Amino acid sequence: MNNDSFSSFKFRRPSSKLHKDPPGYGSRALNSQQSTTSLKRHPSAPVYPRSSAAGSREHLRTRSNAYGSSSSSLDQNSAGASPVLGSSDSGHFHSSHSSRSRPPYSGRFSLNDQSSDELIGAPFDSRGMLSALEEHTAEPDNRSYQPPDPAERYTEKPPNFRSQTTPNPRALRQSASFTTLPPRMEAFPNAAGNDRPTNTKRFSDEATPVRPPGPSRSKKSSFSSFVNSMLGSPRGIKISAPENPVHVTHVGYDNQTGQFTGLPKEWQRLLQESGITQKEQEEHPQTMVDIMRFYEKNARGDDEVWHKFDHAYPQQPTAASPISQPAGSTTYGTQRTSPPTSPRFPQNHEGSFENPRAPPPIPRAAPIAAHAMSPPLGGLVPNRAPPKPPTAAANLVPSRPAPQPPTSSPYSNISTRPSPETQSPQFSTPPIPETEPLPSESQRSRSNSRTNGAQGPWPSVSPSHYQQQQEQAMAVAQQALANKQLERSRSQRQQQQSPRPDQMPIAQPALPQHAPSPEDVALTQASQTARAAPAARPRQRPRQSNAMDVRARLVAICTPGDPTKLYYNLNKIGQGASGGVFTAYEQHTNNCVAIKQMNLDLQPKKDLIINEILVMKDSKHKNIVNFLDSYLHGLDLWVVMEYMEGGSLTDVVTFNIMSEPQIAAVCRETLNGLQHLHSKGVIHRDIKSDNILLSLDGNIKLTDFGFCAQINDSQNKRNTMVGTPYWMAPEVVTRKEYGRKVDIWSLGIMAIEMIEGEPPYLTESPLRALYLIATNGTPKIKDEHNLSPVFKDFLHFALRVDPEKRASAHDLLKHPFMNLCAPLNHLSPLVKAARISRAQEKAQKGGV
């Protein structure tokens, strides 16, 4: 059929079909077996694939009211003519295509099951079918059949034929291949050629019974709803608000009653024992809340700064330091104003062997149990051991616990407390999580951060993922630095240098000599790098690395050899929690040295030992205690240092009255040491008289680097609470960011020590001291009128509350007060007098 005849047929046929009166068949005609015009598909009609029909939105049956029976009229195996298409049309269809072979594209083009079900009981709608066919069988020129408006198609409503028969499962189903426009079939491509044999199967889905309507569909939808409800849908997820939330600790202040609300019992007791009056609490309510939160955070955990004031066994990490005695203790009963009894050597647990001054009287606090875990105020009397930083600051070099004076060892600074592995100024140790408690005094390992190692001192965010990142950064950043440290160690031990065995037995008393293996070197480098790596917002810090890791790192930095064969005539001058301090003489030079022996198994913070060694190794200066060497001897670590026989400045200020020129000389030497540390990016953070050592000649040197922290360009401020409370700068107490200027404030407080014999607020409890530092700012000086104007001006610049306005070490070294400095040998008489007074005090107490 050519295009012209087809076009005329396309536009003429619907009109003749739709305007023709429907045949006058009754419902019985549909069931007649003699019907010659069946709706079965003609053998030559093409079969289209189910997939193309199923994917088409248009291929849906249109419901009609023409049939009201429960099954479609097309499902009846009737021989009668179609009620809509006359017999003439059917005859035309047969005549046109009886001789034409079936197109090769024989995939069945039928309605999906759902559409099939919808057709059941619906009348045959030729208009909807034609629309679907036109959509799928359109020719390349996009010509499509546009059915006339329904108003023009139907001039008479077709009769409502109703079938009285039951559906036959094998009956013909409505198929998109049924059409009255055979030419359209030619629009489909002939993929296999026109000579493809015709498929003799007339009904492509004969074997598939028609799905019965009714309950089965509702069951299916119900089942689907049930499955969806069980599996859940992303869109349906709803997160409810928390139920019955409970705020365990929420402190507030009631302005009407002037009372704090929600105070835990421990806080209430601390406030009662602190000596802070109700009026003071009402005047600065927010400051009180901040201090209590600060105090609570630092008073918990196994390395608390406040626990260093408690009475507890030193080996217990969470226990408070046994140093502080109950209120009635004779140890602290006397004021430091009486030289014979006031200066007190810290107990063994205090890592440093300096002579701390007598602790302040306990404000109306009842004597505290020796092993109290909570730090009652009375037990908080500081032994002058600096606290460890609680919060995580990037690149924080952990500081070891503050010095503890054992017997009268001037090396309290070489305290047996675990010397932190403070990195050399170039290293920055991993930051300590903000939640990390300050070190207890007994531990004196006040290390803020763990040694860097594979197990990293930092908190693991996603612990494993963060740790991996840190370890990767570790191995690269500090390669050169680690080599530098190793070379320095070798150069210092040239005389004793000997080949080391491959392995070093841990349990043997003598340290076998063995060169660090590549693994050890890599581990050391990794640990150093870890310190330099910036820390993410720290969660709680991980458990400290095991003893084997620490030993491996120590092996890499310690000198091989047996120290017992290198030093002789050891004389114990002090005792710490985990070891003692000895004087000894070197075999080849007969020089007197100080040796700090530490039992690694007794160190609460083994990682911190490396911190101090590294800082001292890299800080060679005339005003910094000289680190000589370190050895591993069995289970002990021996740290050999320069011996400062004069002891600490604490004894000098306790038993003597110093003149301004002498004070100026001490300040100048201290500032020189600080300037050197600051130039390397290191903050000491624990400057006080206990950490200033003197020789008999009056030479002055800084010691106790356990609290040192690393700062750099990217992290030039810290916000961790470190140092002993009485020497803390206001920005540290209020937990603001701070930098090098905190050492300048501590120097100013130490100058007041040299004037008055003790720092401000020493007779106050630590909690009240924190309150006074935060609220008063620059402390008042007794008898300030007796000071020279130049000295007052020096103190004014050193004790500025605003760190931005506070002078630097470089500025103070140029201050006119430095012109008053006395020669260092003028300090020698003070040192000797202090030694005599100390010996007398010890004799009165029965000798220690």
UniProtKB/Swiss-Prot annotation:
Protein name: Serine/threonine-protein kinase ste20
Enzymatic reactions: L-seryl-[protein] + ATP = O-phospho-L-seryl-[protein] + ADP + H(+); L-threonyl-[protein] + ATP = O-phospho-L-threonyl-[protein] + ADP + H(+)
Catalytic residue positions: D686 (proton acceptor)
Enzyme class per UniProt: transferase
Domain of life, per lineage: Eukaryota
Region (Disordered): 1-227, 315-548
Biased amino acid composition, Polar residues: 29-38, 63-80, 161-180, 315-339, 409-427, 440-454
Its biological purpose: MAP4K component of the MAPK pathway required for the mating pheromone response and the regulation of cell polarity and cell cycle.
Localization per record: Cytoplasm; Nucleus
Pfam families in alphabetical order: PBD (PF00786), Pkinase (PF00069)
Assigned keywords, A-Z: ATP-binding, Cytoplasm, Kinase, Nucleotide-binding, Nucleus, Pheromone response, Serine/threonine-protein kinase, Transferase
PANTHER family assigned: SERINE/THREONINE-PROTEIN KINASE SAMKA-RELATED-RELATED (PTHR45832), SERINE_THREONINE-PROTEIN KINASE SAMKA-RELATED (PTHR45832:SF22)
Biased composition (Basic and acidic residues): 133-142
Every CRIB domain range: 239-252
GO biological process, one term: pheromone-dependent signal transduction involved in conjugation with cellular fusion
